[in-house]
Amino acid sequence: MNICLLGNNLTNLVLANILLKKKINVDIIYQSKSSSLKNTIRTIAISNENYKFLRENIKGISNLVWPTEKIKIYSAKNKSSELFEFKNKNQSNFFLLKYIKLYNLMKKNKSLKFINLKNYNLDDIKKREYSLIINSEQNNPITKKYFQKKIEKNYKSLAHTAIIDHKKIENKI
């Protein structure tokens, strides 16, 4: 089985690493463009269950995470107004990690095959005879041509964004 993943992003890198572990051939096809990843300071949080899954499937992730037992979400307008709190006794709720470190860890797999195309279209990709094509890149020409105008958009969605402010903790490892 040959699978094509469109986009050089964290979603595809994690998926590719797991598929390769199951002996499935994977190509990551992407368009060359200047990457802003090198300078990103993004931190992401993953749930306890997702961390367990990644730890079982990806070597070295344990060294990248900071477990958290409690996270409080505050209002942006009134910083003393707590909206809600996630906490579990004796168990980590989330694991924080730097996006770029996880991205670089995923990219280290020597079995990954990256195909950089200046301009790609569906016909070029079909010629490669993939069993399955997965597109996780929202701003590529294929998405724009075949899906953007056909998908009904509903912007009545809710997203939580947070800036975490905490006291510095000295690791004695």
Predicted stretch roles:
Residues I3-C4, I133:
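Receiver (REC) domain switch-region micro-motif
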Residues C4-N8, N17-R42:
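Glycine-rich FAD pyrophosphate-binding loop
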Residues G7, Y30-S32, S75, N135, ...:
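Short beta-strand/turn micro-motifs composed of small residues
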Residues N12-L13:
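N-terminal Rossmann-fold NAD(P) dinucleotide-binding loop
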Residues A16-N17, K107:
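A generic structural signal for short, well-ordered alpha-helical segments in conserved domains
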Residues K38-A76:
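N-terminal FAD cofactor-binding segment of flavoenzymes
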Residues E56, W66-F147, E152-H160:
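Conserved N-terminal helical subregion
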Residues L158-I173:
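Flavin-dependent oxidoreductases
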